[in-house]
């Protein structure tokens, strides 16, 4: 039986719903979905330059889980950029505390 999901503190909201290559209609693109917690990990780790320990504490998760989320998010972004896929960003109405 899988472990129950923990509540995670999310403070960042994506300004757009999707990023895609210019000139290609989105209906023709393969899409990669990035989760809200992966998006938050990218923001804290790469944009705000927080250490993994501090970023994990701010999200309310372990450092190892934060590392997994960050690696997964980076892979999805790199795949979308290098292979010309659309990147679907998370859209959430409540970014203070979300059950993921």
From Swiss-Prot:
Classification via Pfam families: DUF134
InterPro entries: UPF0251 (IPR002852)
UniProt family annotation: Belongs to the UPF0251 family.
HAMAP family, per database record: UPF0251
PANTHER family (UniProt xref): PTHR37478, UPF0251 PROTEIN TK0562
Protein name as catalogued: UPF0251 protein swp_0615
